Amino acid sequence: DPNIQGIDELVINEESSKKALNFFKKNKCDKIVIFQTTFTDAKFILHFANVINKPICILAFPEPRTGGRLRLNSLCGLNLGMHSLIKNQIVPNFIIINKNKIFYTKKLNNFNKSKYFNNKIENWKKLSLGKNKKPLKEIKNQKIGIIGIRPDGFDTCDYNSREIKEKLNFNIKKLSLNNLFTESKKINKNNIKKTKFLITKDLKGTKDLNQKELEKSISIYHGLENIRKKHDLNAFAVRCWPEMFTEYGCASCGPMAMMNEKKISCACEADVLGSISCNILNQLNGKPSLLVDIVDLDDKDNSVVFWHCGLAPISMSKKGEARVGIHSNRQKPLLHDFRLKPGKITIFRVSKSANKLKFFLIKGEIQNRKNSFSGTSGVVSLGNNTS
């Protein structure tokens, strides 16, 4: 089609993003289709949308449920990008490609013909706690430790300290990653060996891991526990990469899963609102909770796949099924690797989409299916809760 033009290479870094932006500055288009082929942060898509200022449609792709590494993670990239754009008053169209070619072709044609865009922002402002001046008295006063700063382009992890205190009854203690690394290096080797022996009872395959890296990972668990006691903390939001790999030499997923088991909620990417969400669930139901990504969906049975690298507490596994894992990005332990056990669940998130604090709450049920991807995951039926 002579009316369609575009770039023929992936946007993977600063150089390629500038090249793509310059192309569309020179070649004027009425509308833009962005292929979210894999997971990325939202820096480029936000900057691109602001500069080009044209209607945007983002396409995400299904993820083959191989039981192995999560390779595309396209849907998660779509979620992150949409959140960032909506937060900045930009509401793009989006399409999740499925096997029904007629369906997504029709969606694309509708986007192409439509004269309207970015006119839905009011729909995202309706569900908010913006007018609620009172804190949640039913939730006990809590204190969350933020270790490190959230990665660039992860706008979902933003927070307002005053708002968290006034509306959610949470105080904040900021710490550096070096605080955690220093504390973890001081852990007695005997304590590390005792913990390694204990987790071997629940996790298969510990002997197959690099023992030095495994012990480093266990030391992070003890480091978190010592910091928790020192500062009287109830939850953590931790910058889990890349420094955990590159500077300390292990993954933090397993240690954080162990803290989650103790109902000390731990969220990756220094996601403060994510950790607060888990903490509130812990208080309400007295059981461990888990922060997850939505990485795949099936519109035929209205189900989604909840996943994270290896962050799920051991009690969420069926007895005898839990194994150790190594992180797919850096090949380092410790991760939990198992499917989430079947049963009814509460899905809850404190969110700040469209710059308004709000609660997302829905019921779900984990299905009795095999692990969709390495790490910890579950296929969750949403029943008639959504359409």
Q: What residue spans do the PLM features occupy?
A:
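Metallocofactor- and cofactor-centric catalytic cores in central/energy metabolism, strongly enriched
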Residues: 1-146, 150-235
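Anaerobic metallocofactor- and corrinoid-dependent redox/one-carbon enzyme cores
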Residues: 37-38, 54-62, 67-68, 74-75, ...
